[in-house]
Amino acid sequence: MPKLVVFSGAGLSAESGLETFRDNGGLWAQYDPMEVCNYENWLDNFELVHRFYNLRREELGKVQPNAMHKFLASLPMILNKPRIALSAKKKHKDPIEVIHITQNVDDLLERAGVSNVIHLHGELCKIICPQCEHIFDIGYTHFEPHNCPNCDYGKLKPFIVFFYERAPKYVIMHDIFSQLSSKDCVLVIGTSGNVVDISTILAFAESRARIGYKILNNLQYCPSIAESVFDKIFYKPTTQAIAEIEQELEQFFIS
């Protein structure tokens, strides 16, 4: 089964109005990341940490998925509908599996209609119990400290991967990329490459087997991303690259 792997970063949600970690303004400029996103001292800063993530959930609840989120949600239909028609004419075309891996902790992909998103760095609308690992959804509400309903532990944590904390979904990500082949495509959107070195990951994957096509869409050139890894690059806001990306994907998967 051919695969399209969509790997996204903060630039995807920036056009919805969410401040990114490296923006000069917004919440991140008002708080020290090493105080509100540090696994080694988050318990010492318990109230501050939850105050910060309460504000982030409040911010998230005020924005909507943008056109790129909605386009990504529609990709299974866009790419598979012509292939179904070809199959009916006995020109066999396997359905395309679309896999979403994101560094974002927001739920805008899900709200746009994407299911089974792999969130590498956690999910803002959820809380986790560090003791029993019970996870529960609190939406966009403010978290009021209380004991875990599952094991009664008293220090519940935002379901966010902090600095110096293990990120278990990275194993899944590396496994997905390592299995790609010449019939597969990777679409990278809105990432600087500073946290997850996506170009190195792709280069390593291709040391085993060539990936069919690789597309990059960023607002501008990022030194941490090797342009040579990609077959097509669009430097423009994500919502302005939709038509061109759709054309590239259709040419690869359908033509």
UniProtKB/Swiss-Prot annotation:
One of its GO terms (cellular component) is cytoplasm. Binds 1 zinc ion per subunit. Substrate binds at residues 53, 56. Residues 1-252 form the Deacetylase sirtuin-type domain. InterPro entries: DHS-like_NAD/FAD-binding_dom (IPR029035), NAD-dep_sirtuin_deacylases (IPR050134), Sirtuin (IPR003000), Sirtuin_cat_small_dom_sf (IPR026591), Sirtuin_class_III (IPR027546), Ssirtuin_cat_dom (IPR026590). Pfam families: SIR2. Its cofactor is Zn(2+). Its EC number is 2.3.1.286. It comes from the Bacteria. Zn(2+) binds at residues 129, 132, 148, 151. The keyword Cytoplasm applies. Belongs to the sirtuin family. Class III subfamily. NAD-dependent lysine deacetylase and desuccinylase that specifically removes acetyl and succinyl groups on target proteins. Modulates the activities of several proteins which are inactive in their acylated form. 2 residues (Tyr-53 and Arg-56) present in a large hydrophobic pocket are probably involved in substrate specificity. They are important for desuccinylation activity, but dispensable for deacetylation activity. This is NAD-dependent protein deacylase. It comes from Helicobacter hepaticus (strain ATCC 51449 / 3B1). The gene is cobB.
